[in-house]
């Protein structure tokens, strides 16, 4: 039976229309922004962006702290008919220079300190630089509002940069449909409700982090963005805001599990989500003991297809190392090297099919052809699939388990790291004659 793609897909900026007018949408240090106010801010920032960058489809980058602009920019750029390029705040100037040049960004909004770190030659010609606070002030002063977008769901909405096994970061192209359906899918299987409060501690520059915001707004829930210095800051924010939903990666979960939690903080949590690396059996047990009233979602995903699987929280105690099954709007196949579908408990490559599959790598036809290939003959969706390079197996109950990777990518703190990029950086110092980078196991 052929699977069908949903037809009720809207442009990404329509997410701000889903919450009640007076419901809190964004909780900042200095203010609580309702959905009604959020709609105005998205509209005005979009109007300002159109005045600054009138060319439809132009790329606009943000390299900012986790505040109003970081949260609003994905929707405002989409409404303005532009393509948002969020830059990880942890990246250094050379990496940012590559992203600006590769994406052909027409505008970079950043903190003054980050703008000051750029050197001559880092910014391509035709790219305007502006401090994020100035952008917000000018958008408010201009007060040029932009109506909700009528963009084609297949139109490009964002480019997210992720490390590759062969050097510099590559840009993953995401459409309005990719991001809308990703938000709908996660809100659905997590069971998010309008009274939920999501603490956004992960970087908004990659899919797992950005979806914290988008899936919450799909459900009409509120988001509390947090740039934390220590794990204790996370606990304090959860207690202060009565947070119900926390998404993290294994290294942060390890740190959080080592802390003493006030009852008021741990009891408000309804759900915990993990991606970016596998949870150990010991860590699962510790989290379940620390948060007995919260459902723990173990998940697997890749930027090229957003999210692939999640494990039913009811099975986490008996299957702590499982990746679970496909999320809504995804089809996950296990494929032999021969191209045939693998049987139960047979190892193969994880292949993700369906409407969450990205549009390829920005201006990189060669690497796109390597990773984005026709779906196997047994696919219910057909079309183009993501061949992940990850080796997995599926048991007789349909649960998936991670086995390993084909390439040399290193996974650290939830980030995919290119060993070649590290080696080239070491050689560029002139202090070493040869360099090799590889990952070391860490039981934590």
Language model segments and positions:
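Conserved AMP-binding/adenylation subdomain of ANL enzymes
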Residues: 180-197, 204-245
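Conserved AMP-binding/adenylate-forming
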Residues: 31, 46-94, 201-203, 416
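Conserved pre-ATP/AMP-binding loop-to-beta segment of ANL
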Residues: 143-161, 168, 191-197
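ANL superfamily adenylate-forming
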Residues: 113-154, 259
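Conserved AMP-binding A3 loop
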Residues: 34-36, 157-181
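AMP-binding/adenylate-forming catalytic core of the ANL superfamily
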Residues: 91, 246, 354, 359-360, ...
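Conserved ATP/PPi-binding loop(s) of AMP-dependent carboxylate-activating enzymes
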Residues: 325-329, 340-376, 415-417
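Gly/Ser/Thr-rich phosphate-binding loop
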Residues: 243-248, 257-319, 331, 338
């Amino acid at each position: 039976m052929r699977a069908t793609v949903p037809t009720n897909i809207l442009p990404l900026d329509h997410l701000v229309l889903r919450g009640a007018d007076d419901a809190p949408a964004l909780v900042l240090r200095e203010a609580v922004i309702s959905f009604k106010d959020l709609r105005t801010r998205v509209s005005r920032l979009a109007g300002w962006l159109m005045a600054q960058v009138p060319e439809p489809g132009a790329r606009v980058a943000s390299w900012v702290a986790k505040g109003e602009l970081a949260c609003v920019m994905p929707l405002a750029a989409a409404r303005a008919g532009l393509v948002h390029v969020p830059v990880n705040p942890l990246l250094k100037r050379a990496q940012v220079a590559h992203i600006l040049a590769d994406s052909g960004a027409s505008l970079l909004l950043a903190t003054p300190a980050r703008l000051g770190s750029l050197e001559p030659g880092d910014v391509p010609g035709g790219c305007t630089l502006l401090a994020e606070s100035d952008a917000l002030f000018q958008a408010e002063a201009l007060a040029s509002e932009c109506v909700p977008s009528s963009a084609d769901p297949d139109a490009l909405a964002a480019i997210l940069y992720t490390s590759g096994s062969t050097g510099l970061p590559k840009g993953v192209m995401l459409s309005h449909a990719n991001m809308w359906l990703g938000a709908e899918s996660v809100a659905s299987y997590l069971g998010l409700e309008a009274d939920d409060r999501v603490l956004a501690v992960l970087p908004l520059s990659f899919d797992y982090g950005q979806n914290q915001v988008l899936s919450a707004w799909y459900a009409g829930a509120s988001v509390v963005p947090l740039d934390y210095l220590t794990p204790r800051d996370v606990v304090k924010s959860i207690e202060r805001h009565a947070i119900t939903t926390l998404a993290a990666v294994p290294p942060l979960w390890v740190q959080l599990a080592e802390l003493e939690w006030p009852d008021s903080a741990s009891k408000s949590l309804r759900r915990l989500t993990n991606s970016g690396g596998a949870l150990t059996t010991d860590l699962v047990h510790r989290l379940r003991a620390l948060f007995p009233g919260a459902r723990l979602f173990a998940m697997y995903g890749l930027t090229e297809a957003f999210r692939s699987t999640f494990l039913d929280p009811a099975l986490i105690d008996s299957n702590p190392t499982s990746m679970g099954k496909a999320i809504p709007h995804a089809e996950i196949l296990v494929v032999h090297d021969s191209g045939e579908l693998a049987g139960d408990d047979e190892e193969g490559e994880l292949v993700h099919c369906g409407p969450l599959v990205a549009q390829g790598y920005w201006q990189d036809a060669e690497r796109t052809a390597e990773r984005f290939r026709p779906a196997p003959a047994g696919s219910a969706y057909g079309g183009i699939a993501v061949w992940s390079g990850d080796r997995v197996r599926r048991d007789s109950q349909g649960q998936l388990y991670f086995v390993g990777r084909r390439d040399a990518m290193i996974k650290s703190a939830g980030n995919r790291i290119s060993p070649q990029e590290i080696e080239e950086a070491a050689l560029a110092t002139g202090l070493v004659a040869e360099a090799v980078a590889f990952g070391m196991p860490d039981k934590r």
